[in-house]
Amino acid sequence: MIAARHYRKWWLSHIWPKDFSWLVPIESSSVPGPPECPALDEKFQSCQTVDNISLARRVGPPALLYSTGIDSSIAALVARVSCIPTGGHSSCPREYFLSAKTSLVSLVPTMDWTAAEHESGVTQNHQHRMQTEDHDSFAGEIQKLPSPPAGNTGGQNPSDPADEQGWPQRVLNEMKDMLLLLSSDGKILYASPSCKSITGYDANQLQQNALERFIHNDDKTTFAEEMNECITTTRPVHCHFRFRKKDNSSNTSCLLEAHGHPHMKTSEPNDSPENHNEDCIGVFLLCRPYPTRGSQLLDSFLEHKIENVRLNQRIAQLREEEEEDLASGQQLYAGDSTGDSGFRHNSHSGRSNSNQSSFRDTTGSGEENESSDTLTNDDPDSRSYLENAADELGQTEDMSHIEGIEMLTGLHYGDGERSQGLSTGVRQGRLIRYDMESAKLDQQARVIQDSDRKKRQKGEYMCTDCGTSDSPEWRKGPEGPKTLCNACGCKSAVQYTLFSYSSEMSS
């Protein structure tokens, strides 16, 4: 303490100049200042060593001290100066601006805290430039600082109690999420005003109603389980549910994300341990819409899945209709063929119908196909019927092929009309008439010629040893390739082997 006092005395006497002539009073204010301090007034009235300090009195709390590199006791001492009137200036107001020429100490005033001038209790702080002995760069300017807390105003008027009471309601009105206060049985005791923008209901329409009344039927069970677990375990709850909106005509609902916690009432400490339990007074639930973009993506994904299922069902339905059409066409062909062949027996016709259906059913099993082939090979009537049905089906396919050509080219292809160079853009292109009957005869003649050629090819070879011509295989003989039948060729090979072996043994 002694060292600090000597340091303070040395600092005040050597660093600060001994000039106190630049005190500049500021105009007084109508608002009363801090109370008088006679003891400190007498002490500082006799202090003439405080130089290069501008003291000016004004209304408001004490000035704020900014100090750098000086002793804390000196900073406290200088801070005390700003609250005390000086001698010889009785007309000065009751607060001072304190500013140092050096960079060690800088004291600047705070803003006025007057509730009468502003509803928030803060008025504008008018800046003043300190007058010093010489106008150099060390002269500081008064800075604007935030207003002090309400508890540090000292003698200032406190803020309006009515404004303090309106803050909770203002917070609830500005809140975007929906706040619900539920009873232990799930009844809505309070709903924040934001429920109108989220659900479409007013607060009075939701209050005194069960929350489950507005929840989707599929989510009621899950929500009830979450709430019961929250009340039983006294743990926070986090769940999602669909809330029905007010527009019941379209049966729309919004997906909400809810966070909440129970409010428990503890028994009095004087109660017995048997009665010392916690009762749930209510549950605070804060609900907000689930992210809109994610819900839209989820809805679109579900819509695409549903559309895919619907299209697959439609494809299966069309396939069934196509199979029914094919079956009806086959039955029509079967009826025509049975009308043409009147000599068939009823039992044979029934069996042939079953064989035809099994023959045309590509989705059947291998056993059914095998049984149909067996019946076809055994029964000549069924074989002839199947051949006729296959010919008629081939003609039908040919007709459909011809119709497709006519639709694409515009020619009467079935009547024999042909195009030469028209489709390729040749100038000499023309339409010609092709005789379908002669074409059919030429085709039949070509088929006969092909069959005769195959027969002639089969009968060209003749065994030079036995003279046969129906051998399945032909072998090379003394006269060249394919001159011996299979039997004669084997016999000739054996004889040649024995002859060569005997000649080797004799030699």
UniProtKB/Swiss-Prot annotation:
Residues 170-234 form the PAS domain. A zinc finger (GATA-type) spans 463-488. One of its GO terms (molecular function) is zinc ion binding. GO terms for cellular component: nucleus. PROSITE patterns: GATA_ZN_FINGER_1, GATA_ZN_FINGER_2, PAS. Keywords: Metal-binding, Transcription, Transcription regulation, Virulence, Zinc, Zinc-finger. Disruption phenotype: Reduces the conidial production under both light and dark conditions. Increases sensitivity of conidia against thermal and oxidative stresses. Decreases aflatoxin B1 production. Induction: Highly expressed in conidia. InterPro entries: PAS, PAS-like_dom_sf, PAS_fold_3, Znf_GATA, Znf_NHR/GATA. The keyword Metal-binding applies. Probable transcription factor involved in light regulation. Plays crucial roles in fungal growth and asexual development. Involved in conidiophore formation, sclerotium production, and conidial stress tolerance. Positively regulates the fungal pathogenicity towards maize and aflatoxin B1 production. This is Blue light receptor lreB. The lineage of its organism: Eukaryota, Fungi, Dikarya, Ascomycota, Pezizomycotina. The gene is lreB.
